Amino acid sequence: ACQGYMRKCGRDKPPCCKKLECSKTWRWCVWNPWE
């Protein structure tokens, strides 16, 4: 299952939900305003 907003993400964790992406700096699922 994917993770929602403000959830931990990364190489060893589940992917973020649709419309979200993993922040490369803080390793959280964040909104992607460009998509």
Curated annotation (Swiss-Prot):
Expression (tissue specificity): Expressed by the venom gland.
Cystine crosslinks: C2-C17, C9-C22, C16-C29
Keywords: Disulfide bond, Ion channel impairing toxin, Knottin, Secreted, Toxin
Protein's UniProt keywords contain Secreted: yes
A GO term, aspect molecular function: ion channel inhibitor activity
Main location: secreted
GO terms under cellular component: extracellular region
InterPro entries: Huwentoxin-1
Highest taxon in the source lineage: Eukaryota
Localization annotation: Secreted
Description of its domains: The presence of a 'disulfide through disulfide knot' structurally defines this protein as a knottin.
General function of this protein: Probable ion channel inhibitor.
Family that this chain belongs to: Belongs to the neurotoxin 10 (Hwtx-1) family. 49 (Jztx-F6) subfamily.
Protein name listed in UniProt: Jingzhaotoxin F6-27.63
Provenance organism: Chilobrachys guangxiensis (Chinese earth tiger tarantula)
